[in-house]
Amino acid sequence: MRTATVQRTTKETDIAITVNLDGTGDYSVSTGIGFLDHMVEQLSRHSLIDISMQVKGDLHIDQHHTVEDSALALGEAVAKALGDKRGIARYGEAHAPMDETLTRCVLDISGRPHCVYKSSFSQPRLGEMDTEMFPHWFHSFAQTAGITLHIETLYGENNHHIAESMYKALARALRQAVEIDPRKGDAIPSTKGVL
């Protein structure tokens, strides 16, 4: 099984994350930010990646460190679970509708971290989560996961739907990309021979 555990402890956060890329979408998520929990749960359920995430952050200051560090640790766990990436599909893409909203996600498990984020919100908060933290979450996740990530909300009005469709699109694209392609055997999916 492709699993990994990451423990990240700083003066700002204490994080324990375990992922199973070959899971069924089981999750146990507690970040102290209810809306972020809901989004990571969507990511787990729709990617079929089991995620256990326990985060204690300095929320008495603000959400920045908790959101950033949890995304960094989750990306690191995914990268660690992928190992040398032998046999994976590597690429994934998905469109995720949520009522009036549609988001597209395209990604490459390339080893070259990059994020293009095109989405916006008409209000500063969703529940207790600052909407300005969403682009930061996606950039941080892409950085440590080692993926090239393009995420774009094509249209939408409801802020909750916009956020949720982004995480669901990422989930579906990630599910495709981490899958083992039996035709590849144990080959690394690159002409360079390394990712």
From Swiss-Prot:
Its EC number(s): 4.2.1.19
Record GO cellular component, one term:
cytoplasm
Question: Where does the record say this protein resides?
Answer: Cytoplasm
Q: Which reaction does it catalyse?
A: D-erythro-1-(imidazol-4-yl)glycerol 3-phosphate = 3-(imidazol-4-yl)-2-oxopropyl phosphate + H2O
The answer to keyword Amino-acid biosynthesis applying to this record is yes
What are the alphabetically sorted keywords of the record? Amino-acid biosynthesis, Cytoplasm, Histidine biosynthesis, Lyase
State the source organism's domain of life.
Bacteria
Q: Where are the transmembrane segments?
A: none
Annotated GO biological processes are: L-histidine biosynthetic process
| GO MF, any single term | imidazoleglycerol-phosphate dehydratase activity
Pfam families, sorted: IGPD
Main subcellular location: cytoplasm
Pathway involvement of the protein, from the record: Amino-acid biosynthesis; L-histidine biosynthesis; L-histidine from 5-phospho-alpha-D-ribose 1-diphosphate: step 6/9
Similarity remark = Belongs to the imidazoleglycerol-phosphate dehydratase family.
Q: Which HAMAP family does the UniProt record give?
A: HisB
Entries under NCBIfam families matching the protein: PRK00951.1-5, PRK00951.2-1, PRK00951.2-4
Protein name per its UniProtKB record = Imidazoleglycerol-phosphate dehydratase
Gene designation: hisB
